[in-house]
Amino acid sequence: MKDNNAFNEMMVHLPLCTHKEASNVLIIGANNEDMKAQAAKHNKVSNIEFGDTSLLTSKNEKNIDVVILTDVKIDELLLANIERILKEDGLITFTSKAFSRDEDQLFADLKLVGTKFWIAMPFKFGHNTSIIASKRYHPTADINLQRADLLDDLNYYSAEIHNASFVFPASEHKALTGIAKR
């Protein structure tokens, strides 16, 4: 299994199995056919659009449920654009740095989104670390198990992996306390 299989599955299924009913989803940044295939597994419920950051400025206010940033670095301006279009129960997922490689960047990303979101939690899979930030739904307490368990043809993602990806070693968990909003 390639690391990008895990990336595509986790970046798509984790947020879409956390949100109660994501009808409008934007996937911003680089994507490939496998990313699109993973997203297509949610087409019965979700309208999914792919594009670059200019897609954010073309959307109406408070109209998007989920924004997934595949390789786009989040900053205050981008977050303001996302905040403008995200619904009151919306969430975002984006890549960050691993705790062991650049904890300062991980902390900075968590603090940035923590100002706008009720929940801001890092999750790990393969050699990747990403963050989910949510205005309402908790990624482990509100996982839609039926949706997660009914996804077919997966190599990495499962409901169990979904929950396990939020578990960090004790020292990292302690260091994240007060920064990550769990």
Would you name each region that the model predicts?
Residues E76-L91, L110:
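A short glycine-rich, Lys/Arg-flanked "PGG" loop and its adjoining helix->strand segment in the class I
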Residues M1-N43:
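Class I S-adenosylmethionine
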Residues S46-S58:
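A short, well-structured beta->alpha microelement
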Residues L56-V67:
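A short acidic, Gly/Pro-enriched loop at the edge of an enzyme's catalytic core
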Residues E103-F125, A133:
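Conserved Class I S-adenosyl-L-methionine
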Residues L26, D65-T70, T93:
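Structural motif
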Residues N128-R182:
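SAM/dcSAM-binding transferase cores
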